[in-house]
């Protein structure tokens, strides 16, 4: 499965796919007559820092070149940079951090000495907001779930980072799984939950053994199970592997998937804090959000608020990919400019000029490079510039990039990944992609641009996309 989404395309993925097909004498989507090989297009695999990339069965093939005659398959190494190491202190070492190295869950043990109300108050005071894209205040979410009636409550770790250009959660899960587990335990204790779930994206099968091994370590150490360390608090954790649907990154579609149903978003309200997984009160946070929790409980809200800006507190993990010299995960405080971030990353590769940037994942508006270079990397500044911070996936495009081809490629992704629940999106994304293909092929028609605007407007107001 060869990724041909934007980050990999900028590194020559189309040529790699063509080379493979010519070598094996089959076309994309076809299988060799002996059944030994199938070659497929693939949407973003979360390997953008190792572009161009592919999955061979369940193993990652990274930094592919047509010059290579032998490929090393396995687990990708995290490339972690930046001027902070609060969340990424244990990342970038090329292997998972063991419990003996991570420590005895000191933040969780401190949390057990606090009241649930005090924990939620500390999270609220820190200013932590969701890092998956919505930026909803975490403390408010937790308080809503705690106050909701119900004897069975859940904590769900959304590890389905399917937004093209995003790969930070992959690094956290591969390199520091115990930080994620500890954050889930604290969340469970705070809201009164007794069960947690990891929902792992289908393109990350190689992470599953890492999570399972870390959970086994935590169980053997008495941090998961019944009456944990004689505290009266019990908590179990299970893992569910998704099937690769982009829509299951949406929280309620994710619940449907865990429950064994088709991944359709639910109508809101009611919200997950009252009617979530199995219709019970649920806190769902993404990996990066949960990894902030042990830090806040261990060092306090005041320490946390000193990082970042007044309105965007803490650090942020940015995923730099595309036409950048050093792609990878960068942990920086909110408020650092893109210019500073690009300097850390060695600038635009090959000494070219910056043309455009997608600042927060492929569903965010594209901004011109000159505007982005003067923009602070925080929620308010990106919004004022005309886009959104989203998941923090920064896709860099140089002066050689054709923006019409970029749009055509993005439209293909959203056409392929539409959940199909609403007709304007199910059909409209196909119309848009076909029109853009015509334009890219030099066969554009008068009125195409107006039709594109009209279709985009109708899709944006479909019921599911407004939830």
Q: Where in the sequence are the language-model features?
A:
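Feature of Fe-S/electron-transfer and energy-metabolism proteins
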Residues: 1-467
């Amino acid at each position: 499965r060869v990724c041909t989404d934007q980050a990999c395309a900028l590194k020559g993925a189309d040529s790699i796919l063509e080379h493979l097909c010519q070598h094996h004498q089959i076309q994309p989507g076809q299988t060799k007559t002996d059944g030994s090989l199938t070659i497929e297009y693939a949407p973003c695999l979360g390997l953008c820092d190792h572009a161009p990339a592919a999955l061979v069965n369940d193993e990652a093939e990274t930094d592919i070149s047509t010059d290579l005659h032998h490929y090393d398959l396995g687990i990708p190494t995290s490339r972690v940079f930046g001027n902070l190491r609060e969340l990424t202190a244990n990342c970038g070492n090329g292997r998972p951090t063991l419990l003996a190295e991570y420590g005895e869950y000191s933040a969780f043990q401190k949390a057990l000495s606090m009241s649930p109300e005090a924990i939620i108050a500390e999270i609220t005071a820190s200013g932590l907001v969701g890092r998956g894209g919505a930026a909803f205040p975490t403390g408010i979410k937790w308080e809503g779930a705690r106050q909701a009636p119900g004897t069975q409550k859940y904590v769900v770790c959304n590890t389905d980072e399917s937004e093209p250009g995003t790969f930070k959660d992959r690094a956290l899960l591969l390199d520091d799984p115990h930080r994620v587990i500890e954050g889930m335990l604290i969340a469970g204790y705070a809201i009164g939950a007794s069960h947690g779930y990891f929902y792992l994206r289908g393109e990350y099968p190689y992470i599953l053994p890492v999570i399972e091994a870390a959970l086994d370590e935590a169980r053997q150490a008495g941090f998961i199970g019944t009456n944990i360390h004689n505290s009266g608090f019990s908590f179990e954790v299970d893992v569910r592997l998704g099937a690769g649907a982009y829509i299951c990154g949406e929280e309620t579609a994710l619940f449907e998937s865990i429950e064994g149903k088709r991944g359709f978003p639910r109508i809101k309200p009611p919200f997950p804090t009252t009617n979530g997984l199995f219709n019970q009160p649920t806190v769902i946070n993404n990996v990066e959000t949960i990894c902030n929790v042990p830090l806040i409980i261990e060092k306090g809200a005041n320490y946390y608020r000193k990082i970042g800006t007044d309105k965007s507190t803490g650090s942020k993990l940015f995923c730099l990919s595309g036409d950048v010299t050093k792609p990878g995960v960068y942990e920086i405080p909110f408020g650092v400019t893109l210019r500073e971030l690009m300097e850390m990353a060695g600038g635009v590769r090959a000494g070219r000029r910056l043309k455009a940037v997608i600042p927060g994942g492929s569903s965010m508006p594209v901004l011109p490079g000159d505007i982005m270079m003067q923009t602070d990397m925080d929620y308010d500044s990106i919004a004022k510039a005309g886009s959104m911070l989203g998941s923090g996936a920064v896709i860099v495009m140089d002066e050689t990039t054709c923006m019409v081809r970029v749009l055509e490629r993005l439209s293909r992704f959203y056409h392929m990944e539409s959940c199909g629940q609403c007709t304007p999106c199910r059909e409209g994304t196909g119309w848009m992609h076909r029109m853009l293909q015509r334009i890219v092929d030099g066969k554009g028609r008068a009125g195409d641009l107006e039709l594109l605007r009209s279709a985009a407007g109708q899709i944006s107001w479909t019921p599911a996309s407004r939830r």
